[in-house]
Amino acid sequence: MPSATGTKRVRGVSIFRPFVFGSEARPFDPEKKPPHVPADHTHQWRVFVKGVNDEDISYWLKKVQFKLHETYAQNVRTIEQPPFEVTETGWGEFEIQIKLYFVPESGEKPQTLWHSLKLHPFGPGAEVKKERREVVISQNYEEIVFNEPMEPFYDLLTGGPTSQQTQKGKGGKNTKQAAQQRGGRTAEIPQNETPENPYSRTTENKELDRLEAANKTVEQMIKEERERLIEREKKLAELRESEGIPANTKKR
């Protein structure tokens, strides 16, 4: 029996869509704290799910459910349209459950993520940032992979802003550039980072260079340690010979 309309999958195809999830927290100035905020709340924060470079993700993401700490009233918040975020105030850090619900055309089950809310600066210069009351940003780059998507969902994933189909052909660099110029959707990581988005090809290449340099340093350290070991064994053998101590032989 043939598959019902809209239930056929595009075989042999996997499509990924990138997004960013995380939180931003800003400490209150004690002298300018809003009157409605509880006395023990020290920060205002927001938790979010958004596209890379704030690209629209609502064509594949229907809604997002945030499960906050049980001490919050209505601690399960469902956001059904962009921006997919929740803003609150508080004093403590905790794990936030984030559940992604996809559009009906996808036929996909919800996926769950976890994010650790950060209120206090971390990493290098944390104390300076704390004194300046800087915004604490904790976010992660993630990719959703849709394997063999339903045909209607495939059309949504590959369509442009007006559900225009992408051009068929060999593709390549020129096709990607054309899609970007006409505002088409792309899953490509941007070439350069921006203040709003630290994820880019440039950042990726810098990290690869850093890892390569670290690997070379480790290899050099291993080489030097091996040379020192050989030298020590040589001196030990000379000492044994001068003292008339027979050299140790390895048992077979």
Curated annotation (Swiss-Prot):
One annotated GO biological process: regulation of DNA-templated transcription
InterPro entries xref list: YEAST_sf, YEATS, YEATS_dom
Bias kind Basic and acidic residues: ranges: 203-213
Gene Ontology CC annotations of this record: chromosome, telomeric region; cytoplasm; NuA4 histone acetyltransferase complex; Swr1 complex
Domain YEATS: 9-160
Record text on subunit structure and interactions: Component of the SWR1 chromatin-remodeling complex and of the NuA4 histone acetyltransferase complex.
Notes on the domains: The coiled-coil domain is required for assembly into the NuA4 complex.
Function comment: Component of the SWR1 complex which mediates the ATP-dependent exchange of histone H2A for the H2A variant HZT1 leading to transcriptional regulation of selected genes by chromatin remodeling. Component of the NuA4 histone acetyltransferase complex which is involved in transcriptional activation of selected genes principally by acetylation of nucleosomal histones H4 and H2A. The NuA4 complex is also involved in DNA repair. Yaf9 may also be required for viability in conditions in which the structural integrity of the spindle is compromised.
Name of the protein: Protein AF-9 homolog
Source species of the chain: Aspergillus fumigatus (strain ATCC MYA-4609 / CBS 101355 / FGSC A1100 / Af293) (Neosartorya fumigata)
